[in-house]
Amino acid sequence: MNQEPLSILHLIANASLLVQAVMLLLFLASMVSWVMIVQRGLYQSKARSAYNAFESLFWSGTDLTQLYRQGNTEANRNTIEGVENIFRAGFKEYTRLRQQGSTDPDAIMEGTQRAMRVALTREEEKLEGNLSFLASVASVSPYIGLFGTVWGIMNSFRGLANVHQATLATVAPGISEALVATAMGLFAAIPAVLAYNRFSANAESLTTRYETFSEEFSAILHRQVHAKQS
């Protein structure tokens, strides 16, 4: 008795059109997820390195005005990431309010802290970019795969109506085709959920470090503005 090989490609090629559409959707979701996983990993790694480098420079005793001016050059402007954007936003607003002749230290600090909060929110959004898509793929893909499996199994049993004697050899190919959809759903979901959890934790950790820096920088500016008033 000649049996057709049950290879993955053979099963996909012989699946129904709807099951093939489900498999194609899951394959595309998996590919897009991997692209986003690589991009997010590279971006967060770059943001972490930028934070460590800038923090070392900031606490090295460099004059704040000089540190701000270093970022004004064209070469450095394209490399500014993460915490340095928060520093620049706060120091720019602090300098602007001082140059306007504002004598109220609380008003100066309020404006400075507001500018840093806005910059912090933007950096947080950058860190969490594409995470919602990964979460969607992680949560929805298994159900899409299950839908393809259920549909494929229904077709397999429907085909038994035209068979005089149902055997395992008759049903197995159709069920195998259907189960490939579930496997592809898990293949798309598992990397997405692992990446989402890791990148969410990384984003939360970096955001906490950004917030800590903002508070420390605010304390430095607070001492400066009150020292100049006294």
Where are the predicted features?
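Predominantly long cytosolic amphipathic alpha-helical stalk/bundle segments
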Residues: S49-I144, N155-T167, L194-S230
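Hydrophobic membrane-targeting segments
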Residues: M1-S56
